[in-house]
A protein has these predicted regions:
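Conserved ABC ATPase "signature" region
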Residues: 8-25
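Conserved ABC ATPase signature
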Residues: 30-34, 38
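Conserved catalytic motifs of ABC-family nucleotide-binding domains
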Residues: 51
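Catalytic Walker B motif of ABC-type/P-loop ATPase nucleotide-binding domains
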Residues: 55-58
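ABC-family nucleotide-binding domains
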Residues: 65
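Conserved H-loop
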Residues: 85-90
Length: 118
């Protein structure tokens, strides 16, 4: 990275951390010293900092309690919408469906050539 690119990425990281309610001082701490919720939000910062067109998250709320889970999803969706990123959110937690305008239940799908549901 050039110095300018590095500065831009650092600035973008700080903006995302602020938007996701993370203190910039967390950058100085090892991830093992962060709460699970903080680790999840830092992972989202890392995923969004390069402004991807597509973000795929697999069970990002599995280790969070219901309050932290809903807060995390709201923060994630806010950032995804602001960045105009397509999000594929994978979860076994059906209660999260309320947060999304479209859901796909793969349990009800049949694989071509198969006679039984997957």
């Amino acid at each position: 990275f050039s110095k300018q690119d590095k500065q831009h990425l650092q600035q973008r990281s700080l903006e995302l951390m602020n938007a996701l309610q993370l203190d910039a001082k967390l950058l100085e701490r090892p991830s093992s010293q962060l709460s699970v919720g903080q680790q999840q939000r830092v992972a989202i910062v890392r995923a969004l900092v390069n402004q991807p067109e597509l973000l795929i998250v697999d069970e990002p709320t599995s280790a969070l309690d219901s309050d932290a889970r809903d807060s995390f999803v709201d923060l994630l969706l806010g950032q995804v919408q602001a960045a105009k990123v397509t999000l594929i959110f994978v979860s076994h937690d059906r209660s999260l469906a309320q947060h999304f305008s479209r859901q796909l239940d793969i349990q009800s799908f049949v694989v071509a050539g198969e006679k039984h549901a997957v």
